[in-house]
Amino acid sequence: AFAGVLADADIKAALAGCAAAESFNYKTFFKFFAIIDQDHSGFIEEEELKLFLQTFSAGARALSDAETK
């Protein structure tokens, strides 16, 4: 799903980071999820997804309706 979106080297590095059994860091995953899930509902709603780029930079644009469907 990320092929063509992320660089192959980045995908390989992410997979290598949790290649060993029991090495997946769920705390890091949920930290990232919590940043996007701004209302802490346990779901990422469309309105939160629209603001996804702003988690990287406050001045980033909001995604359009078409981009979040």
From Swiss-Prot:
Q: Name one GO molecular function term.
A: calcium ion binding
Top-level division of the source organism's lineage: Eukaryota
The chain positions of domain EF-hand read 24-59
Tell me if Nucleus is a UniProt keyword of this record.
no
Gene Ontology cellular-component annotations: cytoplasm
Q: What else is known?
A: Is regarded as an important allergen. On the 2D-gel the determined pI of this protein is: 4.02, its MW is: 11.39 kDa.
Protein's job: In muscle, parvalbumin is thought to be involved in relaxation after contraction. It binds two calcium ions.
Among PANTHER family, the record links this protein to:
PARVALBUMIN, PARVALBUMIN ALPHA
Family to which the UniProt record says this protein belongs: Belongs to the parvalbumin family.
Task: Name it.
Answer: Parvalbumin beta 4
Q: Which organism is it from?
A: Merluccius merluccius
Q: What is the lineage of its organism?
A: Eukaryota, Metazoa, Chordata, Craniata, Vertebrata
